[in-house]
Amino acid sequence: MVYLLLGTGFEETEAIAPLDLLRRAGVEVATVGINGKVVYGSHGIGIEADLELGQMDLTSLE
């Protein structure tokens, strides 16, 4: 499992492009909102994260 952490003011393209490429490659990826489930990027675009920070399963990390 790969966690992509998203915080307020993140660069949308820098988050979405790698997320797309990883998922196309078959990598299991979850987006994680640091400041809640909905996170707003630098251009005001809201992204609903898969998880909030407290929901991460740290036992699945390698």
Put a short name on every predicted segment:
Residues 1-62:
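Extended, subdomain-level signal for the structured scaffold at the beginning of enzyme domains
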